[in-house]
Amino acid sequence: MLASEVIQAYEAFCPQEFSMEGDSRGLQIGTLDKGIQRVMVALDIREETVAEAIEKGVDLIIVKHAPIFRPIKDLLASRPQNQIYIDLIKHDIAVYVSHTNIDIVENGLNDWFCQMLGIEETTYLQETGPERGIGRIGNIQPQTFWELAQQVKQVFDLDSLRMVHYQEDDLQKPISRVAICGGSGQSFYKDALAKGADVYITGDIYYHTAQDMLSDGLLALDPGHYIEVIFVEKIAALLSQWKEDKGWSIDILPSQASTNPFHHI
């Protein structure tokens, strides 16, 4: 079958046009007009991902984070980042990117986060189109800030969790309304605040932004960017279901390579 058939099914679920303005999306490397036998799902395209794809004979990678997100000035093999692109092209591996559209689409990444944490009666944080938006906010079983932090740490299997608060008393504050945005969602914290969030969960919170959040009366949890790795398992499961429903004769492989650059001691 053609790679384009897989992507046609994917875009019926998660249209490219749902992406935020200026986002990197869609086919970035190779062609979809080719026969494929193996599709791999990954969070990132790094050296480890490419090596795995080559070893396993992968023809198409569906990835969340675009490998090309800065202007390319040359393709000199002496630059490690360029070698990633060169190896993909050399081995005829197509790369398709699904970034903010999977964050925004219904039953996409942010809804999966809500299901994992028990956040219910949700709506989006910021509108990005007709009846759709980025981030989610909803209600959760009443608990303390500390209890929510422990739940987040356990659910996402984290070795550490950054908590945004000043006073020890904050740990016992009652929490019932929670906002969440995968990735780097600090720019939406005022939307979370405006919609009544007690706590905002997002990654990559800056030092001064954390202070601003607290001044505005909003607690926060920063589990990091890598919680988005559930993209791999979830999309691989969807592709496997479509394979069964549509009779595709291809292999679906969730990437086993860890691309998390952070570890804590």
From Swiss-Prot:
Annotated residues for binding of a divalent metal cation 2: H65, H225, E228
Domain of life: Bacteria
GO MF assignments: metal ion binding
A single GO cellular-component term on record: cytoplasm
InterPro entries assigned to the protein according to its UniProt record, in alphabetical order: DUF34/NIF3 (IPR002678), DUF34/NIF3_sf (IPR036069)
PANTHER family reported in the protein's UniProt record: GTP CYCLOHYDROLASE 1 TYPE 2 HOMOLOG, NGG1 INTERACTING FACTOR 3
Protein name (Swiss-Prot/TrEMBL): GTP cyclohydrolase 1 type 2 homolog
Organism encoding this protein: Streptococcus pneumoniae serotype 4 (strain ATCC BAA-334 / TIGR4)
